[in-house]
Each structure stands twice: as C-alpha cells, then as structure tokens.
Design a protein with these regions (language model features):
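Active-site/ligand-binding loops adjacent to catalytic centers
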Residues: 68-70, 200-238, 246, 258, ...
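Active-site-proximal loop->helix
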Residues: 137, 145-208, 304-314, 425-433
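Claisen-condensing/thiolase-fold acyl-transfer catalytic domains that form or cleave C-C bonds
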Residues: 268-276, 368-434
C-alpha cells in the first residue's frame, strides 16, 4: 500500500476494538515463577491471594493457560468513552530528524486520567463492584494510576483510598486534586496512618517515599478493613492482561495498512504499559510467526532490568506482600527523587522479567536530563506535551531513528506514548531552569539493596 495513504492518525472503528484480552503467559514456554507466601515461602494459593485481591482478579493472576479472556460488556462499554486510541505517524518528527525511519506512537493520553492506566482501573473496579465490596485501596506514583482508579471507582460507586508517593504528592498537587474531585482520599506515603508507614518513617526520616512504600501501606489498609481489597496499577499479571488492549489495537491498526514494525519501544517501571504494548507482538515471536526487536526503557536512577538481579523479592518495602521472582534492586532500595514517579519501582513484572531473562527483549537505562531533552523536542515538533515516563520511550525512539539516519535503514519504529505531562510542570520547570540533575546509583548503593533479598531455595 502506498505510503501516501497512511494518515497522521490511524483509528479503528468501535466495532474493531478488542473483545478479548490477550494473555501472553499462555504462549510462553518458560512460565513466570509463582508468587510465594511471605510467611511460608510456598506458592500462594487462590484462597490466600483472595484475602488481598478480588476473587476474579485472582483467577486472572494465576491463569497461564488461556490465551484469550473475554472482556465483560460493561468494561467494553466504558472503554468506548475513550477508546480506540489513535496510532499516530510521527511525520513531523521524522522530517525534523531527517531520518529514513518510519516512526509511530500509540497515544494513550486521550482520557481524563491522562494515561493508559484507565484500561486496568476500570476492569479492577468492575470486579470489585461485582464482588459486592465497599471499596479498594491502592498506591500511586506520579498519580496517573490513582487518578484512573478514582475515576473507575466513581463510575461504579466504590470508595477509593490512595497512598501517593510523597515526592509526587508534593510535586503534583493538581494531580492530587483531580483524584479528590473524583471522590478518592489521598494520603502521602509513607504516612503515620499505618503501622508499616510509621516503621518506614522511623527507619528513613525525611524519606520522599517510593512505590514499594506506598504499596505496603495500601495493602495494610485493605487487609485491616472489612469489605475492602487492594488493587495494583502495574507489575501483576492481571494488569498486563488488561493493558493488552493497547497492543491489540496497535497491531490491528498496523495491519490495516500492511505495516510491520521492526522495533517496539516502551518505558518500563513495573511493566504495565510495556507489557500491554508488546504482548500481542511477543506472542507472534514466541510462536515463531514473526520477529521483532523489543526495547524496555528505564530510568538510570532506578535500573531494575539493566543492573538488577533476577531473584525472588518482596513486591513492597514493608515486606507484607507476596514474593515475586523478578528483576529487582531489592525491596529496601529507595530511588532518588527523579521526575518520573511512575517508574520509581524497585522491581519488574514477573512476566516481563522472564521474557527478558529468556533473551526475548532488551533493556536500556537513560538519564533524566536526556529524557527531558527528548520530551521538549517531541513537544515542539509533534504538539503533545509528553509525561516524563513516556519520554523515556521517546528518547530511545529518537536514538534509534538517528541510527537509521546514519545507516540509511528504513526501519519502522513503534513506541508507546503512555500519557500527557500537563501535571508534571515542576519537572519541566526544573529542566528549563537548568536545575535538573542526573543521579545514577553506585554499585555500593545497589549492593545494600541486594543484601536484603530474601533467601529462597
């Protein structure tokens, strides 16, 4: 098909939207290792997980055999409010870079939450409501997940308690107020409201928090209240399952114009966006149908894939959550206060960790000043102000496009633009004022985190 016929934005029709989520674990030869009970170090049973998570979500978490799972009609109806999202051809960026590469990005910022997080938030809220629960608790880093969940809970009339990483709580007051507007209560983490929060504050006075800290508090808040369950915005298998709508739509849009990507790039914190984007393409690679280059991009200040260890570790700082086998910096690792709050997590999805360990994708770490250079370049050329998290993928997409400029290769690059950065102006202000710095943890600092890894036979 002629390139001239490829529009700036490729939209699917509503009747072309996915009716099933794709479960990449079903096609994996080496399955992700099971979650372990922190007390017994034995695989978690559905009954044990049911004390923390909603029943139907537990089934999804443990399902590594069914490749497709039906999306309930109520969730599909909600998706129609903001999906399908566009796959955008970055013609202006290509021209500015002078590259023969073809660049596409899947834009997930066209909803009030400002990011892809709503795809899983509405699913988890639906199952909580269906179970007859009063409410849910959660953590949030930059605030996108908390915003998405507050929207979903408002839709299903559920109570929503959010523990927000303290550095983001302070940097992003407007994100906090959006959550409150949708009815959520928002607490900076670590806090004095939970036992684990008080313990972390005593051990790390003045800490700016981390996703691991906030998870611990949210889990405690859920398990000590009748009629509540904990929900998570990343890392877990169930979240990657719900986020597969991103990759399924991307794949369908590309196929409409007979486009085959060479490189697929996503930012990586806990893995929700990356897993959602690459899963359907990874399935083809696993089945030997096609080959793609997958690149996970993480902050150099929190490099779980590029410098972490593949081991069982606690998913939270307070060590109350199940243990997951993943690439980790240690649950006690507290990353520097970088401006990509959604990527400040010590570990990585077990599913993505297994795929990475099997050599099926690669990872790169980038420093935040170079990330914001790419973010501003993208904003000025493509007209979208990207979230700091998304900008990690932009950085590497530009790098790959410039490589094509040097070699003359006409590669097709697809990356995930997870959301907008309109609530991240403190970060942009720091960059514009020349006050932004890069921080890369030393080997000695990482060793402290590794020393705390649990001993699992």
């Amino acid at each position: 098909m002629s390139e001239k016929k490829i529009p700036y934005k490729i939209y699917l029709e509503e009747n072309e939207m996915p009716t099933q989520w794709y479960n990449v674990r079903a096609d994996m030869k080496n399955k992700p290792a099971p979650l372990l009970n922190p007390a017994t170090l034995k695989p978690m049973t559905a009954e044990e997980l049911g004390h923390v998570f909603c029943d139907e979500l537990v089934k999804q978490e443990l399902d590594d055999t069914n490749p497709y799972i039906d999306i309930p009609q109520e969730i599909r109806d909600f998706y129609r409010m903001y999906r399908p999202s566009p796959l955008v051809r970055a013609y202006c960026l290509e021209k500015k870079l002078g590259t023969p590469a073809k660049i596409y990005y899947k834009f997930e910022g066209n909803n009030t939450s400002g990011s892809h997080k709503l795809n899983s938030a509405i699913a988890q809220a639906y199952y909580a409501k269906k179970q007859g629960l009063k409410g849910v608790t959660t953590e949030t880093g930059a605030g996108q997940w908390g915003t998405a969940l507050s929207m979903a809970c408002a839709y299903f009339d559920l109570d929503c308690k959010v523990y927000m990483v303290k550095v983001s709580y302070e940097q992003k007051p407007f994100r906090r107020e959006v959550m409150r507007t949708y009815g959520a209560s928002v607490t900076p983490s670590p806090s004095e409201t939970t036992e684990v929060g008080r313990k972390i504050l005593a051990e790390h006075p003045g800490t700016t928090g981390s996703l691991g800290c906030a998870i611990s508090e949210a889990v405690e808040a859920a398990t000590t209240r009748e009629g509540y369950r904990y929900v998570l915005g990343s890392v877990l298998n169930q979240v990657l399952l719900h986020q597969s709508v991103i990759g399924l739509e991307t794949k369908a849009a590309l196929e409409k114009y007979d486009i085959t990507p060479d490189i697929i790039i996503g930012c990586a914190g806990g893995g929700s966006n990356l897993g959602g984007l690459i899963s359907p393409f990874m399935g083809e690679k696993l089945c030997g149908e096609k080959d793609y280059q997958f690149i996970a991009v993480e902050p150099a200040s929190c490099p779980s894939l590029t410098r972490g260890r593949y081991a069982y570790d606690f998913c939270d700082t307070g060590r109350v959550c199940p243990l997951a086998k993943m690439y980790t910096l240690g649950s006690g690792f507290i990353p520097s206060a970088n401006h990509a709050g959604g990527l400040r997590y010590h570990g990585m999805s077990s599913t993505l960790s297994q795929l990475y360990d099997d050599g099926l994708m690669e990872a790169r770490s980038v420093e935040q000043t170079s990330v914001f250079e790419a973010a501003e370049q993208f904003a000025r050329i493509e007209g979208i102000l990207p979230a700091p998290e998304s900008s990690h993928a932009i950085r590497v997409a530009i790098d790959e496009a410039l490589k094509c400029k040097e070699t003359g290769e006409e590669k097709t690059i697809v990356f995930g633009l997870t959301g907008t950065g309109y609530f991240d102006m403190v970060a942009y202000e720091k960059f514009n004022n020349g006050e932004m710095t890069d921080y890369i943890p030393t080997d000695e600092e990482l060793a402290v985190g590794f020393a705390g890894l649990p001993k699992v036979e």
